C-alpha cells in the first residue's frame, strides 16, 4: 500500500507522514529531505546553486545515511533546496529512488510536493495537506526557535509565500492537488487532530468510500 501526501512548506505533511507510517507499520520518506541533502552537498562544496549539472551529480552520489542530519532542517539549506528542486533534470534523477522506496514492502508513506501527481500517480491513498500561510509561518518559527536558531516570523512568512509561488509555478512537477487526492486543511488542527483526520481519510479510501 502506498500513501502519498502532498502540500506546501510547513503545512504539517511531514509530521502526518511519520505518524501514518508508524500507525500502519509502513516505511516513511520525507522526499523534501532528499532535496535538502542535495542542497547541503552543493553548499558544503561551494557550488553555484544555479549549476544544474552539479546538482544532478550530487543527487547520483546521494547517501541516505545523512537524511537524519539536523543541519538539513536549517533555513539556509531549506531555501537552497527550494531553488534546486525546480530543476527538471534533478527531479528526474531522483524519481527512481523515490519510486523504488515506495515499491518496497510492506507499504510506504511518502510526503512531498509531487508524490500523488508524478512520483506515485497510482498511489492507493492521496492526501493534499494545506494550512493558512500565517499558521505555517508561526509553526516554522517555533520549530527554528526550538532548535536554538534565530527566527523572525515576518521573514519566515515572506519566505514561505515566496516558496509557495516558486513551487506552484515551476515548469517541472509543480505543486498541485491530484484530482483524486483528498484535501486536509490543517490550519486549525493540532498534531493529534491532524493525525486522526488523516487516518480517517485512509480508512475511508480503503473501505471504498470517497471522503469529500
Swiss-Prot record:
One cellular-component annotation, GO: cytoplasm
Segments passing through the bilayer: none
Residues reported in the UniProt entry to bind ATP: 7-15
InterPro entries according to UniProt: Cytidylate_kin, Cytidylate_kinase_dom, P-loop_NTPase
GO BP terms: pyrimidine nucleotide metabolic process
Keywords associated with the record: ATP-binding, Cytoplasm, Kinase, Nucleotide-binding, Transferase
Localization: Cytoplasm
Molecular function GO terms recorded: ATP binding; CMP kinase activity; dCMP kinase activity
EC id: 2.7.4.25
HAMAP family given in the database record: Cytidyl_kinase_type1
Sequence similarity: Belongs to the cytidylate kinase family. Type 1 subfamily.
Entry protein name: Cytidylate kinase
Originating species: Rhodopseudomonas palustris (strain BisB5)
